Every structure is written in C-alpha cells, then in structure tokens.
Amino acid sequence: KPNPERFYGLM
C-alpha cells in the first residue's frame, strides 16, 4: 500500500 507520507515527500 502506498504511504501518503512518502507520496508527499516526492512533491
């Protein structure tokens, strides 16, 4: 499952 924290880190 994709972690939102990591997703935001890419931004």
UniProtKB/Swiss-Prot annotation:
It is found in: Secreted. GO terms for cellular component: extracellular region. The keyword Cell membrane does not apply. Keywords: Amidation, Neuropeptide, Secreted. The modification Methionine amide is found at M11. One of its GO terms (biological process) is tachykinin receptor signaling pathway. Tachykinins are active peptides which excite neurons, evoke behavioral responses, are potent vasodilators and secretagogues, and contract (directly or indirectly) many smooth muscles. Belongs to the tachykinin family. This is Ranakinin.
